[in-house]
Amino acid sequence: ERFARENSTADRQFLLAAGSAGIEAATNLVVHEANRTMLLYVYLAVTLFCLITFRSWRATVVALVPLMLTSVLCEALMVFMGIGVKVATLPVIALGVGIGVDYALYLLSVQLHHQRQGMSLVDAYRQAVAFTGRVVGLVGITLAAGVVGWIWSPIKFQADMGILLTFMFLWNMLGAL
């Protein structure tokens, strides 16, 4: 748009693409702009619900930092694999955040319970991992096992999503533990 605006003259006019290429370009532009907005809303909602659930800003930060790291690493993996942010890939990062906060809810709720009963941070963490760590590990591995087979799909989108989802499920699990 900027190029057409800056370089069009009375004798020569640059028009934006039409047909499939134009629609794809316009869609990509909207998706690119929507990606950051979507992540902002997702993280605001997760922050709000963590604050309500845990009643602790520290616990909220502990839950959010691994999720944000996973989002950044997922986007880096997408760049490395040559996967663009498209309408079909846009929800993947949000899904990873939703699954990741689930792991954090399991562990932090038990840890905070033990801390409120007077346990030290280290002992409360050990108790939380002993009590719910196996469940978090089982859920993470089960979710990853459900999509890891997609990696060998002849459908490129499905194979790419298999890699991304497997990565996000396992990385979020490790981040929570």
Please identify what each model-predicted range represents.
Residues 20, 24-28, 57, 121-129, ...:
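Alpha-helical membrane-protein architecture signal
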Residues 95-138, 146, 150:
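Cytosolic juxtamembrane regions of multi-pass inner-membrane proteins
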Residues 33, 37, 41, 45, ...:
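Alpha-helical transmembrane segments of multi-pass inner-membrane proteins
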Residues 30, 34, 51, 67, ...:
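Amphipathic alpha-helical segments that mediate coupling or scaffolding at interfaces
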Residues 47-51, 72-84, 133-177:
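Hydrophobic, glycine/alanine-rich multi-pass transmembrane helices and their short helix-loop junctions
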Residues 1, 48, 52-64:
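C-terminal, well-structured subdomains that either form a transmembrane helix-short loop-helix hairpin
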Residues 59-109, 175:
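Hydrophobic transmembrane alpha-helices and their membrane-interface caps
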Residues 2-41, 48:
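Juxtamembrane "pre-transmembrane" interface segments
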